[in-house]
Amino acid sequence: MSDSTIRTYSSDQRQTDNDETVSTPDEDVLTCPECGGQVIDDEEHGESVCVDCGLVVEENGIDRGPEWRAFNSTEKDEKSRVGAPTTNMMHDKGLSTNIGWQDKDAYGNSLSSNQRQKMQRLRKWNERFRTRNSKERNLKQALGEIERMASALGLPKEVRETASVIYRRALSEDLLPGRSIEGVATAALYASARQLSTPRSIDEVANVSRIDEMEFKRTYRYIVRELSLEVAPADPAQYVPRFASDLDLPDEVERRSRELISNAQADGVTSGKSPVGLAAAAIYASSLLTNHKVTQSEVSEVTDVSEVTIRNRYQELLEATEAAA
């Protein structure tokens, strides 16, 4: 008797649920306030329109879909801007997970000794799974080296990203055999800074690198040639803002320095000259011309250019300016 009652109730309940399920869509259908007809959404025009009388019930509707079109799944994945952010500065592009170094649980409580040992083992295995082969270990080491040098040189994120892409290209085209990881990473960072008009001198990059300057120059020429990188000659004017800022000089000095360099370029004086030396001499000359005097030794210390070079380029800049006048 009891079982029969239960079965009967369950059957009635299922029938009631089915009735509710069937009736739910009818409640969601919009009806026209004028004629009671069905209202449809015209997504192309952003309007809700009655199919019977043509009344526009709503207009300027919000299009909640993407503004781009994709014709296959590959295009959809490439154009989509949702999901976890990716970056070329990590060997796995930031798609894997990390186990935090803090030995605390979700509530901020310290872990016991056994739990700490367990987490240490998990971190070790997690790191091994993230770098499963020698190629990934190579990439991880190189990208870490790029990040270290870029941080020491004060280079922005865009330069680091581009340097990472250059290194990945060198790795994929098998350009590393016979060359050190540090050498290719240094060359990639220097080329990236040149491409994005945030140059650093060869001496500056060599000072933060773990390789000697000769290997750095040789590897840089090789990478640029093999990857067909478009690297324009360094413009001395690109160094001026940084040097002027380091010397705490006003905008007037920076503006005058650019004029001196422009005159020298028009006169052909800059050909074959170090851009850093020309920028240092322009800063020194413009500071004297605008009565914001700095000594040659101060400019030399900031720019890492010898005082002899500053004096020689200084004379050439003044001669070019006089010729332009």
From Swiss-Prot:
List the CDD domains: CYCLIN_TFIIB_archaea_like_rpt1 (cd20549), CYCLIN_TFIIB_archaea_like_rpt2 (cd20550)
Give the residue ranges for region: Disordered: 1-29, 73-93
Protein's job: Stabilizes TBP binding to an archaeal box-A promoter. Also responsible for recruiting RNA polymerase II to the pre-initiation complex (DNA-TBP-TFIIB).
Q: Which GO terms describe its molecular function?
A: DNA-binding transcription factor activity; TBP-class protein binding; zinc ion binding
Q: Which GO terms describe its biological process?
A: DNA-templated transcription initiation; transcription preinitiation complex assembly
What family classification does the UniProt entry report for this protein? Belongs to the TFIIB family.
Q: Which sites bind Zn(2+)?
A: 32, 35, 50, 53
Which Gene3D superfamilies does the annotation name? 1.10.472.170, Cyclin-like
> Which intervals carry biased composition (Polar residues)?
1-13
Q: What is this protein called?
A: Transcription initiation factor IIB 2
Zinc finger (TFIIB-type) stretch: 28-58
List keywords of the entry alphabetically: Metal-binding, Repeat, Transcription, Transcription regulation, Zinc, Zinc-finger
* GO CC term (a single one): transcription preinitiation complex
PROSITE patterns listed in its UniProt record: TFIIB, ZF_TFIIB
**Where does each sequence repeat begin and end?**
144-227, 238-319
Gene for this chain: tfbB
